[in-house]
Structures are given as C-alpha cells and as structure tokens.
Amino acid sequence: MDAAALAEKWREVVDNPYLRDFPFKLELNEDGKVEFAMSPATNRHSLLQGKLQALLLRCLPHGVQMPECSILTSKGVKVADVVWASDTFFERYRDATPYPKAPELCIEVASPSNTTDELTQKTRLYLEAGAVEVWIVYGDGVVEVYGPEGRRAQSLFGIAVTPLEV
C-alpha cells in the first residue's frame, strides 16, 4: 500500500467510533491492517509519558511536545508514545494525521510485553522516517538514546536523560 493510501486508511481508523475506546494503541502495518501496538497501558507507562513530556517542556521550551503521535513509516503507521517537534516541523505538518515524516525526537516507553526486536524495529523506522534521535525508556527509568549511527552515550538535544526519576 502506498503512503497516501496508508495515510487515508489511518484517518479512517482515527474517525471510526468503534475503535475509539480501546485501552491500548492501534497502529497500521504496511498493508494497512490494524495491529494492536501494545498491551493495555499501565499507570506506570502513563506516569513515564507524563514525566517525559514535562522533561521536554522544561529542557526544550521551543517546539512542541506531544503524546501518542502517529507517524507514517515504511512499515505502516506507528504511534510514538511521546515526541518533540521543532517549531519548523510543527508549522509545516501541524494537523497532518499521520505525520508524513517523523518529528525530530521520538520516544517509546517500553512495556513489559515489548520484545527487543519490536523496540529495535520501531527505532529504525522512526530514524528512517526522519527522526534525529529515538529514546527507549524502560519501566525503571533507564533511557537508551539512539541516532542513525546507533546507540549514543548522550542525547544530542543536551538533555541528561538517564535515569528518569519514577
């Protein structure tokens, strides 16, 4: 399925009243099929999302931080738990759903059910879609930072990220 068809399919999913009340994220694979992205969210997962948004707001006051951001990737529409987008990115794509390109920083909060392969694939997909950096955040507050070259010792955004207080 091409990018335009995937984006249209995603908008149909978002607008479908029968799919609105699931307690977990939905994503689309590259064939436009709905996938359940994770097990139902725990309160710890939500707490980490909130702490990450607060951290981004404090450390990167310019730009926009948001939860649950849909991004068109080569493997379908994926939903990052938290993202930060520059003002330039946001002005360009503001209300697009899904975003046709990844915001500069994409963050995944790992769930106990996530496999290493799933997290590695999402990291790769966000970077291929244009993210400058991807963070994987574990339940204990440990943060792994990745760029196109692989794992980084620290964030290029100048944020001391590990470990997060939870």
Predicted stretch roles:
Residues 1-166:
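Gly/Pro/Ser/Thr-rich low-complexity, intrinsically disordered segments predominantly at protein N-termini
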